[in-house]
């Protein structure tokens, strides 16, 4: 941290997005204590057969699936995700992406991945928010893995109602057919890693995978920040 950053930190201290404790000069978004106590899933060690991967069985051609942490509404982790999505904090997404990537490299999760493909927002929603939180996660992952981010290869063409209070079947109906591929050439013959913030029923990621599945030679895997533990 340079002198100007230290000065800014003095007049406007950086706080942990989970516990609110003041961060040290070497900490980013999360303090070391909260990083240590994140409810990690360890799904990356069994990427073909874990509770998240099982959501896609017989529904989408997804090779491996994993989430970094378990997510519960109204928890400390939910506060972190809320900050990422709704409090104009793209830097939190990048920091979490770096943290995810560092953990997942140990399990060789990124082996043979060619591209990071963030799940897109609609143009209206991205304009309202100022950024796509999934893209910020992907940018952070890219900083560690040096994998390219294909942020414009997939488009969300319509916005339907929020998924928050819908059943699994309603969620699937809500997202069916809403994603379209805008750059087929960059995806041909590639192993793409779909990046999203939270996986609850897998409906959004399934819809993305279905939109991608017809591309020649494509392989699809997924990685999310959180997985809702039912």
Feature names for model-found ranges:
Residues 1-195, 200-230:
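Glycine-rich phosphate/pyrophosphate-handling loop used in enzymes and phosphotransfer proteins
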